[in-house]
A protein has these predicted regions:
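Substrate-binding/catalytic cleft of secreted carbohydrate-active enzymes
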Residues: 2-197
Length: 197
């Protein structure tokens, strides 16, 4: 999973050889209708990503943004147009508007907007993704109570259910080491500032 950044071609080359599958995001794809220059740069970035990576068999999904909420109609129109432009360049991949925060089963929702492989239609349902990155971290017996009662069970039979960030944290972070490293730099970045709070 190339999460929040464009994938590394060396990694994709190895993934192609090993038969691994990847999900790629351009990173930073946050359009703003008041910023046409920024929108043009972001559009160019995502188009270049598709042109560069469309020949990699390991790549199965393009995702525009990580965990984006609902967009105003003008912004949503720009996002969907970028997805359509990607489709023209690569008809073979699933293209998602965003990952996570589907609001319910089998309902239309901006979090579910996608374009399917070899299809030009923009769908507002049929793809369900909800993140629980913290998850249980490791398996424990309490997660399975029976064939109809277990962790990640879904009754959603009409959509593809994808838990994109599921139990992503399997060990405690090295917080003291992170703090030491971040304090060496004057600019901490958005996430560095969060880590030091």
């Amino acid at each position: 999973n190339f999460h929040r950044f464009i994938g590394n071609t060396d990694v994709m080359n190895y993934a192609d050889e090993l038969g691994l599958l990847y999900f790629e995001e351009p990173g930073g794809f946050r359009l703003d209708v008041r910023q046409p220059f920024m929108n043009a740069v972001l559009h160019e970035k995502v188009i270049r990503m598709v042109k560069r990576d469309r020949s990699h068999p390991c790549l199965v999904i393009y995702n525009m943004m990580n965990e984006s909420g609902n967009a105003a109609p003008e912004k949503l129109e720009l996002e969907i147009q970028a997805m359509k432009d990607m489709r023209v360049l690569d008809p073979s991949r699933l293209i998602l508007r965003t990952s996570a925060w589907a609001k319910g089963d089998d309902i239309e929702d901006q979090a579910k907007i996608h374009i399917r492989p070899y299809d030009e239609k923009v769908y507002w349902s049929g793809w369900y993704d909800y993140h629980r990155a913290g998850g249980p971290a490791v398996w424990n017996e309490g997660l399975y109570k029976g064939p109809d009662d277990y962790y990640n069970d879904t009754k959603n039979k009409r959509e593809i259910v994808f838990f994109g960030e599921e139990g992503a944290l399997s060990s405690p972070p090295r917080l003291e080491k992170n703090k030491e490293d971040l304090e060496k730099y004057s600019y901490k970045g958005w996430d560095g500032r969060e880590f030091l709070r």
